[in-house]
UniProtKB/Swiss-Prot annotation:
Binding-site positions, Zn(2+) 1: 51, 53, 74, 183
Subunit structure: Homodimer.
InterPro entries (UniProt xref): ADH-like_C, ADH-like_N, ADH_Zn_CS, GroES-like_sf, NAD(P)-bd_dom_sf
Localization, UniProt: Cytoplasm
Cofactor: Zn(2+)
Family: Belongs to the zinc-containing alcohol dehydrogenase family. Class-III subfamily.
Binding site for Zn(2+) 2: 104, 107, 110, 118
Comment on bound cofactor: Binds 2 Zn(2+) ions per subunit.
A single MF term (Gene Ontology): zinc ion binding
One CC-aspect GO term: cytoplasm
UniProt: an alcohol binding residues: 53, 74
Annotated protein name in UniProt: Alcohol dehydrogenase-like 2
């Protein structure tokens, strides 16, 4: 009898990396993961990765989003262990991606080709579970609830995810590559292809050369962009960027008395056709906007402004035709578009291997935080069973 049939409908005891206090190392503890309820699936995590969003919430020590204890992690791949009632389209053994961005497949926006903003669910990122509010599926050794993280919580051997946040994928794709498609790569590629719709011969500038920014570069490279300018303070990112088609580099620390946008405009005659802000700083969003050409320049904001600061845009610049828009998850509908990305990878159209710079065991998860925080990794794969 396999383990799935033994554990189905019962709590599972497993290891999880728990954040008990802001900024402190995660603690690997034994926890209990309850069985899935209606519309939920319990997943065995195969591997997970670390995103800057995880680091942001790891440091967060106040406000409604700061909750302890908590299981972080949202970029991962797993296998279905068991399903709850009213679950269609998933079965034991399916390879799946848990995704923080929901798709209910019923609301006006999910049905429309114009947006990926699920109006049924996307406004709530405070709950533990999508349909059951603050009810948690995790308990520590003392029987106390552990908070979920943006409906995924992948820093655990098992997790429970609502079907609105779950995508079934082909088992042919390597699982480490698949994990990247659940957040960073999908966000960058989607922004380049679906939101910006970059044309051949375009000039592009990308602010921030982390995994999202490099995925943008890969996307515009495949669209035939003629000039791809990367902006980053870390000179090591420049060599990595070349593998994704970046042709020119700007280090803000070396711009002297000029602003970044002034340097970009000089490099591109009057400005870039497309500008992508992948960091999440209001000041850089403004610089990204000023870096684009009058008449048709388009700025896409992918980074989340951590302090929710406003940005200031010149009304005359808007009148002259420059535009700016934001995007969550690159404008992609997870259930519809992620399988397409998987297929393009399997057809060898996408270079994603170079995004993985480190691999660690689950017990080494705190090292992954330090590598990313210090700018020494792009993506670190954390293996649950190695």
């Amino acid at each position: 009898m396999d383990k799935a049939s033994i554990t189905e409908g019962k709590p599972i005891r497993c290891k999880a990396a728990i954040l008990r206090k802001a900024g402190e190392p995660l603690v690997i503890e034994e926890i209990q993961v309850d069985p899935p309820q209606a519309y939920e699936v319990r997943i065995k995590i195969l591997c997970t990765s670390l995103c800057h969003t995880d680091v942001t919430f790891w440091k967060l020590d106040s406000g409604p989003l700061a909750r302890f204890p908590r299981i972080l992690g949202h970029e991962a791949v797993g296998v279905v262990e068991s399903i709850g009632e009213k679950v269609d389209g998933f079965k034991q053994g399916d390879v799946v991606l848990p995704v923080f961005h929901p798709q209910c497949e019923e609301c006006k926006e999910c049905i429309s080709p114009k947006s990926n903003w699920c109006t049924k669910y996307t406004n709530d990122y405070l709950s533990n579970t999508r349909r059951y509010g603050m009810t948690s599926r995790f308990k520590d050794s003392r029987g106390e609830d552990i908070h979920h993280f943006i409906f995924v919580s992948s820093f655990t051997e098992y997790t429970v995810v609502d079907i609105a946040h779950l995508v079934k994928i082909s088992p042919e794709i390597p699982v480490d590559i698949a994990a990247l498609l659940s957040c960073s790569v999908a966000t960058g590629l989607g922004a380049a292809w679906k939101v910006a719709d970059v044309e051949e011969g375009s000039t592009v500038v990308i602010f921030g050369l982390g995994a999202v920014g490099l995925a943008v570069a890969e996307g515009v490279r495949l669209r035939g962009a003629a000039k791809i300018i990367g902006v980053d303070l870390n000179p090591a990112k420049f060599e990595i960027g070349k593998r994704f088609g970046i042709t020119d580099f700007v280090n803000p620390a070396l711009c002297g008395e000029k602003t970044i946008s002034e340097v970009i405009r000089e490099m591109t005659d009057v400005g870039a056709d497309y500008s992508f802000e992948c960091i999440g700083l209001a000041s850089l969003m403004e610089e990204a906007f000023k870096s684009t050409r009058p008449g048709s320049g388009k700025t896409i904001v992918l980074g989340m402004e951590q302090k929710a600061l406003p940005i200031s845009l010149g009304s005359y610049d808007l009148l002259r035709g420059r535009t700016v828009c934001g995007t969550l998850f690159g404008g992609l509908k997870p259930k519809l578009d992620i399988p397409i990305l998987v297929d393009r990878y399997l057809k060898k159209e996408l270079n994603l291997e170079d995004l993985i710079t480190h691999e660690l065991s689950f017990e080494e998860i705190n090292k992954a935080f330090h590598l990313l925080a210090e700018g020494n990794s792009i993506r670190c794969i954390i293996w649950m069973d190695k």
